[in-house]
Amino acid sequence: MTLALQQTLKEAHLTPQEIDLVAVTQGPGLVGSLLVGINAANVFAYTYKKPLLGVNHLLGHIYSAQIEHEIKFPALVLLVSGGHTDLFYLTDHLQIKPLGTTIDDAVGEVYDKIAKNLNLPYPGGPLIDQLAQQGKDTYHLVRPYLKNDNLNFSFSGLKSTLVNLVMKQNLKDINIPDLCASFQTSVINVLCEKTKRALTKYHVKQLIVVGGVASNSGLRQKFMTSFSNLEVIFPSLQYCTDQAAMIGIAAYYQNQITKASKKYDLTAKPNLFF
């Protein structure tokens, strides 16, 4: 971490003394990974007597849209990543209402699991997306968890169906592009349908899609065409996956409401939500 901090300051042409605020991801996530960043932030902020702020990782993803666009309130946010599949309603900065979440597996997690069973290298999401563009929806897989009136998601059944299908057949007998296309079509249709349901309940000025899976070309195309009557915001690909810029911009807005302190005892919150 020391080398990373030194390199970052060098590329930014800044000295530690010129930093105004130190922000670090406090959760959710794996506690070991969180502690690496938190311990480094505690020490850095203490050494240079800078205010310190712990930031919700999910808030960072939401504010990744603000890096290149101006969020217009109220807004609906779909966060899709390896660890999360959530719908949020935003009425103002840091005024966030959770509407729905996954009750089991997150979308990105399922992508990686299917890719592993197809012997595709990690990370599997981009490769499945590429293969899906070459295939057709010939398997007609179930659109899971739509026979209800809530805004939650469930992808464990779809994952199990695909894993069992691959296990029962020889990989060489499977049309992998068609299977990827069928899987991706199922997932995207579910995300689209749940988003449509949310929009019938909440009036918004923007629809924002963030998280690692927001880089998926099929998802981007589907949402841009399905919600053409609404301003749809996707971050650039570099801001979809985890990066420091989103934590920095989230901290900027968070600090305007909850001022950072000069207490250097931040701890990890692996189950942090809203």
From Swiss-Prot:
Gene that this sequence comes from: tsaD
Subcellular location: Cytoplasm
Matches recorded under SUPFAM superfamilies: Actin-like ATPase domain
Organism: Aster yellows witches'-broom phytoplasma (strain AYWB)
Enzyme Commission numbers on file: 2.3.1.234
Protein name, as recorded: tRNA N6-adenosine threonylcarbamoyltransferase
One Gene Ontology cellular component annotation held by this UniProt entry: cytoplasm
Residues annotated to bind Fe cation: H57, H61, D242
Catalyzed chemical reaction(s): L-threonylcarbamoyladenylate + adenosine(37) in tRNA = N(6)-L-threonylcarbamoyladenosine(37) in tRNA + AMP + H(+)
